[in-house]
């Protein structure tokens, strides 16, 4: 993901109270295609709810014109999926 796109995300991270954000999946591995979405895992500074996650996703998609999947670190459980997120993790904020 180009640095310019990451810089565009930072004001949104600040406005949503994001403590940490990282890419994972094909974009983090550099294997994305034009049809790929951006997989993002975040941690909030404060208590959050589903509306915060959905709002962040929508605002990122509107600002960058690419589809996003947003999950939280808190939602990760042990197992293959969590392992793959941590293996691919490329911290871009926090």
Q: Where are the predicted features?
A:
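Catalytic core of pol beta-like nucleotidyltransferases
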Residues: 1-20, 28-34, 45-94
């Amino acid at each position: 993901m180009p640095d310019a796109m990451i810089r565009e995300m930072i004001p949104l991270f600040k406005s949503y109270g994001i403590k940490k954000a990282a890419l994972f999946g094909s974009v983090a591995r550099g294997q994305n295609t034009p049809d790929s979405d951006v997989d993002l895992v975040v941690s909030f500074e404060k208590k959050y709810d589903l509306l915060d996650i959905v709002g962040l996703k929508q605002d990122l998609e509107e600002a960058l014109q690419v589809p996003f999947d947003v999950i939280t670190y808190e939602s990760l459980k042990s197992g293959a999926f969590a392992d793959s997120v941590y293996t691919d993790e490329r911290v871009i904020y926090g």
